[in-house]
Swiss-Prot record:
Residues 1-28, 104-124 are annotated as: Disordered. It is found in: Plastid, Chloroplast. The keyword Plastid applies. This is Small ribosomal subunit protein uS12c. It comes from Gracilaria tenuistipitata var. liui (Red alga).
Amino acid sequence: MPTIQQLVRSERHKSSKKTKSPALKGCPQRRGVCTRVYTTTPKKPNSALRKVARVRLTSGFEVTAYIPGIGHNIQEHSVVLIRGGRVKDLPGVRYHIVRGILDASGVKDRKKSRSKYGAKQPKT
């Protein structure tokens, strides 16, 4: 416990919280242009071909973002919206592409969790 004199000499320093998505610069989402769309393999116990895109953001960063859902229409030069959120089994992928906004279409024939994948309500 410091004395009052010690606190007068140098105040307590705030511990700054390090952000997990620095490329967003405090914004909830950011717009960007895809520079490369490709598949990559996950870490050890899992096996798949995960769809990812390299995106140049309006904040100046170039990040790797995951494309969620089954099937996509994203290609090079597509304008997409990026949100935070990492993919646990893909090292270095700390962002998600938001489906159903800008050039990224929603997932086709999606019945459940539609809002997460930008799918419209099915016709009854």
